[in-house]
Amino acid sequence: MHTQINKYMENKLSIFLCGYRKGMGAQNCLLYLVNKWKLSLDRSDKCGILFTDLSKAFDCLSHDLLIAKLDSYGFDYSSLKLILNYLSNRFQRVRVNSDFSTWTKILTGVPQGSILGPDLYNFNSNDLFLFLALDVCNFADDNSPFTTAPNIPSVLQQLTNESKLLLEWIKNNQLKANPDKFHLILSEKNYSISINVAGFEIENQHSAKLLGINIDNKLTFDKHVSNLCFKASQKLHALARIRNFMSIKQSKILMKTFILSHFGYCPLIWMMHSRKLNNRINKIHERALRLVYKDDVSSFSDLLKKDNSFTIHERNIQSLAIELFKVVNRISPKIMEHVFPLKETLRYPNENPFVSFKIRTVSWGDGNLAYFGPKIWQIIPQEIRNESNLSLFKKKIRQWKPINCPCRICKNYVPCLGFI
């Protein structure tokens, strides 16, 4: 049933609906947001995003409204009756120690923990993109409208208008919003600026968390990466205490699971951070390798060779290459083609298939993956780029060491001249 419904609905769902869909995740959603924001900042535009909050969205979904929406999508009578039967006549009770409450009938919501629950919630949320005028960063019940404009007053006006439309959609869908928990981030240092949403003043903040990523108004991700480094450093101390009781193989498993794993969530979002933070990440990685191999003499590069591994930054570049491969071979989510647009025609063989962006600033343009990605694709060896199988490409790219990487972290810095 899950497979049949998703196959039928796949082309009916918005490409910007990123949650609970095959091949899509939070990283796709955030990449689209960050890409548009950086491109706008490079043009000297102003940007803003409104983070929203819903209360128990999965538990408040109206069964009758969902069935009506599925009917509009073309579900036949027997299918609608089957889904309504699946949702109806469910009961729940609460257990506290050995005491139980009385059984209560569930009148709204989708069964959480079920394979169909997230699908049905997606189908219910799909019309949100027709209701709103601005772009929306959407993942499950996280809906964050964002916009760009030549000046801050225009951004505020657009977000204010959009918040009214969003609250109206939430009300019409019998969901509950928490405007007092909304957050506003503008590409503006003046934190006294605010917008009014349902009687609540939402003030501009320096940063806020969206889908597990701390997003700041300058898109530096300094706070997010610093938090990752702090968490990884704490685990280093734990590894140091128990290292003598484990083999190298066991220590490597712990290093990858409890230390390096902190840098594995949505790495393409924050990978274009500062060189200072990259050095900090490398230092943590180096300390971890020294503990694993009990080696206080070898250099970081020698430790990597001994471990047959790459730096975190090199791994991130490899991950970026995999996303680019998916786009080139038309197997990526459609939303990624908005991040890495392809040329309509190629004039000669082995031409870079991605649209080249002209940038105006180093701060925003050079750090944008839409600009940086095509450059990375160009330095990948041709025999790897020409691979047609995703699994084989992943295997080869994970063995490829990026050489002559054009990013700010890898470039040489010359005083008075900058990065060359």
Language model feature labels by segment:
Residues 133, 202-269:
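Basic, alpha-helical interaction scaffolds
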Residues 11-32, 48-51, 94-120, 146-152, ...:
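Short, conserved non-catalytic motifs in the polymerase core
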Residues 1-111:
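Conserved pre-catalytic core of RNA-dependent polymerases
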Residues 57-73, 144-168:
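Catalytic palm subdomain of template-directed nucleic-acid polymerases
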Residues 161, 176-207:
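Short, conserved micro-motifs composed of acidic
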Residues 38-46, 167-185, 209, 268, ...:
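Short, charged alpha-helical motifs in flexible N/C-terminal segments and linkers
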Residues 4-17, 42, 118-150:
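Active-site palm subdomain of RNA-directed nucleic acid polymerases
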